[in-house]
C-alpha cells in the first residue's frame, strides 16, 4: 500500500476556529477528495508549525511515496517562527520525497524554498473562485491536466502570488489575476506540481469560508 503524507499549512488555532465554525479543515477536505478516488492509501498528517513530533517525521520522510501540501491563511513574506518551521520542513521534504503536489500556500512554500519569490497580488485576488484559468501548450502535455478543459474555473482563495519561479520551472497555466496558476519543477529529489487553486474544496465549503471570514475580508478591504 502506498504511503502519502498530508501537510497541514494552517496554524492549530486557525483549524480550531474552522472546527468551531462547522467548517472542515483543509486536511479534512484533502482526505475527502482522496477517498473519493481511492481508499487504498496509507495517509499520515503533519502540521510543521504546531506539532511537537516534527523531528521524528523528518527522520522517516523517505518512506512516503508522495506528499500533498495544502492551503493556509499565512503569508510567506511574514517572517514568523511558524512560517520558518514550514520552510524548514519543506526543505527536508524536497530532499527526501520524490513526488509533491503543492496546493496554493503549499505551492508558495515549495517555490520559496526552491529559490523563487512570492509577493502580494498586484492585479487583485481570488475570493472564492478563479475564473478563466488557461492551460498553455506545456500544460496540455502535462499529466496534471490530462483530460482537463483548456480553460476552466475552480475554487480559489489567495491574496499572494508567485512572481519569480525557481530555475528550470515549467509554467503550465495562468489567468488574468495570477500568471502562475500551475507549474512543474524539480527541487532536490522532488518532482513538484504546484497549483494556485483548490480542487479539493467544494464550492459549498468556499461559500462557508467567505461567510466565516467576512469580518476579516472587510477589515482588510479585500473587496475594494
Residue ranges and their predicted role:
Residues 1-88, 92-96, 223-224:
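N-terminal beta1-alpha1 cap of cysteine-dependent amidohydrolase-like domains
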Residues 2-19, 24-36, 89, 135-224:
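Amide-donor transfer/coupling interface in amidating biosynthetic enzymes
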Residues 43-48, 77-80, 130-134, 149-151, ...:
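Short, flexible loop segments at the rims of nucleotide/cofactor-binding pockets, characterized by
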Residues 46-49, 121, 157, 174:
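Conserved beta-strand termini and adjacent loop/short-helix elements that scaffold enzyme active sites
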Residues 50-55, 126-128, 140, 179-181:
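A short acidic, often aromatic-flanked loop/helix-cap motif at beta-alpha or helix-coil junctions
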Residues 58-61, 109-112, 163-166, 184-185:
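Short loop/helix-cap segments at secondary-structure boundaries that form the rim of catalytic
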Residues 72-139:
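Cysteine-nucleophile active-site neighborhood
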Amino acid at each position: 500500500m502506498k504511503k502519502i503524507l498530508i501537510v497541514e499549512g494552517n496554524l492549530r488555532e486557525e483549524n480550531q476556529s474552522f472546527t468551531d465554525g462547522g467548517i472542515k479543515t483543509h486536511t479534512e477536505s484533502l482526505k475527502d477528495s482522496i477517498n473519493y478516488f481511492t481508499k487504498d492509501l496509507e495517509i499520515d498528517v503533519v502540521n510543521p508549525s504546531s506539532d511537537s513530533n516534527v523531528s521524528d517525521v523528518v527522520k522517516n520522510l523517505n518512506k512516503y511515496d508522495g506528499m500533498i501540501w495544502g492551503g493556509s491563511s499565512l503569508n510567506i513574506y511574514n517572517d514568523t517562527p511558524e512560517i520558518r518551521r514550514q520552510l524548514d520542513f519543506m526543505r527536508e521534504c524536497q530532499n527526501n520525497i520524490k513526488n509533491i503536489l503543492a496546493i496554493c500556500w503549499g505551492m508558495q512554500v515549495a517555490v520559496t524554498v526552491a529559490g523563487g519569490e512570492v509577493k502580494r497580488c498586484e492585479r487583485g485576488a481570488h475570493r472564492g473562485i478563479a475564473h478563466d484559468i488557461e492551460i498553455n501548450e506545456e500544460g496540455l502535455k502535462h499529466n496534471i491536466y490530462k483530460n482537463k478543459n483548456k480553460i476552466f474555473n475552480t475554487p480559489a482563495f489567495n491574496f499572494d502570488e508567485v512572481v519569480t519561479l525557481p530555475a528550470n520551472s515549467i509554467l503550465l497555466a495562468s489567468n488574468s489575476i495570477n500568471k502562475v496558476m500551475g507549474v512543474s519543477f524539480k527541487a532536490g529529489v522532488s518532482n513538484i506540481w504546484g497549483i494556485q487553486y483548490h480542487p479539493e474544496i467544494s464550492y459549498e465549503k468556499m461559500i462557508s469560508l467567505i461567510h466565516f471570514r467576512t469580518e476579516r475580508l472587510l477589515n482588510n478591504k479585500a473587496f475594494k
